[in-house]
């Protein structure tokens, strides 16, 4: 994986273990555009990186056995659990909640019941979030889970959240996202004191709406004050101005998709330029090694695996259209988070932040209008 890692401490169930000791990951074998073929091939790649891991592979038994027969490395770490159905990519979350025997639901059940410490699915995002909130449930002190992911920048990697789980947020949600993003960067990127920025329309303190200014005030007066950079703008995301960028799910999703589109456009334009004539083609031969390194660095498969943070277990969403290498990256994220006590880190941060209750109370005294919207 591209990420640096810290050493493990506690499992999601609270039992002490190290990364060398076995743990179980529940995997939705039927999710995603590629279905079991991509999932099992991805697990075969992940098996080389995590030989001590155990996977509870959930889905249609006959189909999964057929795929495992083609991938002995995956078969060596997998135990199949049959599921009678799969959640379609276009099913509404409310409908998905009623399908109790789906591969996605049984994967969540395995985490909730302590059989597995984490879950990975390439399936329906909305259904996955709804099931995670109902089945796995949120951590104490967290009002809403958020979707977080890692993206490349000019200075390394940045953690961004929320990327679509919560379209509308208040200042409390943004503060919680900052706590969870800081814990994510510590556990997954190995940063001892990640810097935090609130995404805004300008870096000046007076810019933005009331909820952004309230969240900034709370963070400036919290135990994260030394790490809080203040407001950041869109260009700061790729510049690597901060290690964590916090925003609401609507803005975060738009920023994410805009960045992905800009990257695709840049590669299309480069191809057009280097095919425009003989000299351009000769120039391509000279710069090809550097372009290949850049392509590898920016390969979205390396960063596949968005995480629903704030839940009572590790829940990782793989991109539905990824290939085996991309799915393996999502499995890497889940396995690394399980072994590196990610949720324990969030619990510690929540308690260290002078407690969220005290922060909220102080903010309401400072901003009387806050109580009215609480």
Curated annotation (Swiss-Prot):
From the broadest rank down, the organism's phylogenetic lineage runs: Bacteria, Pseudomonadati, Pseudomonadota, Alphaproteobacteria, Acetobacterales
Species assigned in the record: Gluconacetobacter diazotrophicus (strain ATCC 49037 / DSM 5601 / CCUG 37298 / CIP 103539 / LMG 7603 / PAl5)
Superkingdom: Bacteria
Q: Which gene encodes it?
A: plsX
Q: What is this protein called?
A: Phosphate acyltransferase
* CC annotations in GO: cytoplasm
Gene Ontology MF terms: phosphate:acyl-[acyl carrier protein] acyltransferase activity
Return the Gene3D superfamilies for the record.
Isopropylmalate Dehydrogenase (3.40.718.10)
> Looking at its record, which EC class is this enzyme?
transferase
Q: Note one Pfam family from the annotation.
A: FA_synthesis
């Amino acid at each position: 994986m591209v990420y640096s890692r810290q050493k493990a401490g506690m499992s999601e169930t609270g039992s002490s273990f190290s990364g060398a000791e076995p743990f179980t990951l529940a995997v939705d074998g039927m999710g995603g555009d590629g279905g079991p073929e991509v999932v099992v091939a991805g697990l075969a790649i992940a098996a080389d990186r995590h030989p001590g891991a155990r996977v509870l592979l959930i889905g249609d038994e006959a189909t999964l056995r057929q795929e495992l027969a083609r991938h002995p490395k995956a078969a060596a770490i997998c135990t199949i659990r049959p599921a009678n159905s799969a959640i379609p990519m276009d099913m509404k979350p409310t409908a998905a909640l009623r399908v109790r025997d789906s591969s996605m639901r049984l994967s969540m059940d395995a985490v909730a019941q302590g059989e597995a410490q984490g879950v990975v699915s390439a399936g329906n995002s909305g259904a996955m979030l709804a099931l995670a909130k109902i089945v796995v449930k949120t951590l104490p002190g967290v009002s809403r889970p958020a979707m977080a992911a890692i993206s490349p920048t000019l200075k390394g990697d940045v953690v961004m959240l929320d990327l679509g789980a919560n379209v509308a947020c208040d200042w409390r949600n943004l503060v919680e996202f900052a706590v969870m993003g800081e814990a994510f960067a510590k556990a997954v990127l190995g940063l001892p004191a990640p810097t935090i920025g609130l995404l805004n329309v300008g870096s000046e303190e007076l810019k933005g709406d009331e909820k952004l200014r309230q969240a900034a005030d709370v963070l400036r007066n919290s135990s994260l004050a030394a790490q809080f950079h203040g407001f950041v703008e869109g260009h700061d995301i790729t510049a690597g101005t901060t290690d964590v960028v916090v925003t609401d799910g609507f803005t975060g999703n738009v920023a994410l998709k805009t960045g992905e589109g800009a990257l695709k456009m840049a590669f299309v334009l480069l191809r057009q330029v280097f095919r425009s004539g003989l000299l351009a083609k000769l120039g391509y031969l000279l710069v090809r090694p550097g372009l290949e390194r850049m392509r590898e660095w920016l390969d979205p498969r390396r960063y596949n695996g968005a995480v629903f943070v704030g839940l009572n277990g590790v829940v990782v969403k793989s991109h539905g259209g990824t290939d085996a290498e991309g799915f393996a990256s999502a499995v890497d994220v889940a396995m690394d988070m399980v072994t590196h006590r990610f949720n324990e880190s969030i619990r510690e941060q929540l308690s260290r932040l002078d407690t969220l209750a005290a922060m909220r109370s102080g903010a309401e005294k400072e901003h009387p209008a806050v109580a009215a919207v609480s």
